[in-house]
Structures are given as structure tokens and as C-alpha cells.
């Protein structure tokens, strides 16, 4: 099942989706028919330039959403919050898929509509994600920051082209669950949703405001394609530290540009990002695999287990042994 659209200020996902699949739409609520699966899609209009789309369903077929880049310039931004337990495949420009879920460093995506993307939702898997659509001018007014850093300045500037990723903390996950559970029959439901969405945006932009205050490069489809190729290379063997000269040569980008765009997009240097992913995998293996601390350390390429223990404690606040024994 494929749903394809071209990004624009006028595009309304829930209306076009209901027409394409012949599903009735009532009060901006679309119930997934039993023939397709179960769940719903809900739109909440929070203002002329501010809206929310809630996706919560389990489908019988793989579901692919293809977003084509906007034909005309627009200052509409899309902010995706992936609250899935299971990773989703996100593809830019037909490159290899990148895994996204609430548990990784890229669970939140902030992007302009001039970038194409393909998201694949696997069949028989619970899908939960929220999309906030807002114009840069409306967002600038909401944030009300007198002296924004370069990241916030770029995001709230009309005509900019960018893609940013952020991790999702427990607070954000709880807010998303609260939003999905709001009773929309309540007279003040829209107001409550707006309060919660603003809280959601506060946590996101508070983190983005703490990023290094350096000049931001415009990001284009070809750049996004190369950055995801680099990310995939890093994730393909997290027991092997990334070597920037080789990465730059592989994707055909200068080392300087690669380092700057990667840090700009993912919020950290290539090596630090690699270490975060490495520690996330260590935490998962310690809890789920039944491996011993030494087995996890060696599996992730650590020859010195003391170094592994110190690094893990730096990220998680406890030693691997203590972490593996806690519930």
C-alpha cells in the first residue's frame, strides 16, 4: 500500500488519504477499516498555520508514505515525533533505509518540505507517530526568542532548507501518549492538545537551543542522501570506529563539509554520535541478550573492559554490571 503526495501548504493528509482509500472522514477523525487493519488518523487544527496529525494504527499490509519535494517555495515545516517501539525505515532519495524509533538518537525529525522522503511502516506492527505542521513565521512567534542561536534562527527563517534530528527523552514520550489519549469529545480538547503540543515543542527546541552556536549550511536532497549513507556505514559495524577520510571519499564530500553537515543535522560529531549509538547497543544487549559484561564489551570492539565500563558509566550513570542487574 503506497500513499504518495507532494508537500505544500494546502496539502491535507487526512483528507487525501480518506479519498484515496474510500474511508469516511468525520470531524477530522479517520478510523482504519477492519479490511485494512485497526487504529486511526486524527487531525487537530490549532490555527491557520499550525496543525497536528496523530497516527496510531496497525495495518495488514506494509504501508509506504512517499513525500515528494514541494514544487513551490513554502515556509511550512514538518516536525515528526516517532514514538514507535519497533524501528521504522526512512529513506531519502532512494538510498538505503535508515532506522528510526523512540529509542534512538533520531526519533525526532525537523525538516523543510523541499526534501523528499519515503517512510515504510511494516505490516502487523503497531505504528505511532505525530506530525506537527507549522510555518516558520508562526513558530518564530510562538518561541519568542530574542537572541536565538544559529539553529533556531535557521529553523524560523522563511526560505531556509534544513534537516535536523534529535533524540526523544522519557518526558517527550509521555507527552505524546497523553496527546494520543485526549478525549476529543471534550469541549476544551483542542485547547488541551494545543497546550500539550506547545509543551512538546518546548522540550524539542530547548534541546536545539543548546546546540553549538555556529553558522548553518543549507541542506539539499543530495546532502541528506550522503549523510544517511555515512550514518548507515557507521551503524553497519559499530565495533569499528569511523574513519572520516574514508567516509568522505566514499560519499564524495569534503571532510570539512561532511563534519559540519553531520554535526549540524544529528547534533554531534561523527565520533561522538558513533559512541552514543555504541552505548545504546551496549545498554540493549546488557538488558535483553543475556550476554555478560565482557561479552558485550568484546562484541562492541572494546579490548579494554575498564575503558568500556568507564564510557558506559559516563553515558548511563552506572557501571555495565549494575545496569544489567537492575529491573
Regions found by a protein language model. Give the residues of each.
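Short, conserved beta-strand element in jelly-roll/cupin
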Residues: 56, 73-89, 132-134
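…primarily DNA-binding HTH/wHTH and HhH modules…
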Residues: 310-327
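Conserved hydrophobic/aromatic pocket- or pore-lining residues that grip, position, or stack substrates
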Residues: 193, 234, 258
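Short hydrophobic/aromatic patch on the recognition helix
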Residues: 257-258, 262, 307-308, 312
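Alpha-helical bundle regulatory/interaction domains
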Residues: 1-5, 87-90, 94-222, 227, ...
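Terminal helix-turn-helix DNA-binding modules in bacterial transcription factors
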Residues: 228-241, 245-246, 264-306, 325-327
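N-terminal low-complexity or simple alpha-helical regulatory segments
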Residues: 1-75
Amino acid at each position: 500500500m503506497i500513499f504518495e503526495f507532494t508537500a505544500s501548504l494546502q496539502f491535507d493528509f487526512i483528507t487525501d488519504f480518506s479519498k484515496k482509500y474510500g474511508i469516511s472522514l468525520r470531524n477530522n477523525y479517520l478510523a482504519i477499516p477492519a479490511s485494512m487493519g485497526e487504529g486511526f488518523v486524527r487531525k487537530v487544527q490549532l490555527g491557520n498555520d499550525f496543525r497536528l496529525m496523530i497516527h496510531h494504527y496497525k495495518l495488514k499490509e506494509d504501508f509506504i508514505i512517499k513525500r515528494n519535494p514541494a514544487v513551490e517555495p513554502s515556509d511550512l515545516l514538518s516536525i515528526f515525533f516517532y514514538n514507535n517501539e519497533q524501528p521504522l525505515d526512512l529513506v531519502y532519495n532512494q538510498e538505503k533505509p535508515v532506522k528510526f524509533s523512540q529509542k534512538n538518537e533520531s526519533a525526532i525529525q525537523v525538516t523543510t518540505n523541499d526534501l523528499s522522503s519515503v517512510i515504510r511502516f511494516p505490516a502487523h506492527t503497531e505504528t505511532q507517530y505525530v506530525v506537527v505542521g507549522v510555518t516558520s513565521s508562526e513558530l518564530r512567534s510562538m518561541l519568542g526568542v530574542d537572541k536565538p542561536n544559529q539553529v533556531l534562527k535557521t529553523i524560523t527563517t522563511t526560505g531556509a532548507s534544513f534537516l535536523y534530528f534529535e533524540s526523544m527523552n522519557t518526558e517527550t514520550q509521555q507527552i505524546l501518549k497523553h496527546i494520543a489519549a485526549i478525549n476529543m469529545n471534550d469541549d476544551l480538547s483542542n485547547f488541551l492538545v494545543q497546550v500539550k503540543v506547545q509543551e512538546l515543542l518546548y522540550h524539542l527546541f530547548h534541546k536545539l537551543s543548546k546546540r553549538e552556536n555556529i553558522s548553518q549550511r543549507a541542506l539539499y536532497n543530495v546532502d541528506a542522501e550522503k549523510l544517511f549513507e555515512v550514518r548507515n556505514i557507521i551503524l553497519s559495524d559499530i565495533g569499528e570506529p569511523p574513519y572520516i577520510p574514508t567516509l568522505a571519499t566514499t560519499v564524495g564530500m569534503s571532510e570539512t563539509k561532511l563534519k559540519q553537515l553531520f554535526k549540524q543535522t544529528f547534533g554531534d560529531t561523527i565520533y561522538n554520535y558513533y559512541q552514543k549509538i555504541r552505548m545504546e547497543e551496549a545498554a540493549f544487549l546488557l538488558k535483553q541478550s543475556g550476554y555478560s559484561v565482557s561479552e558485550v564489551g568484546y562484541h562492541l570492539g572494546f579490548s579494554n573492559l575498564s575503558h568500556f565500563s568507564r564510557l558506559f558509566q559516563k553515558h548511563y550513570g552506572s557501571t555495565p554490571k549494575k545496569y544489567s542487574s537492575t529491573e
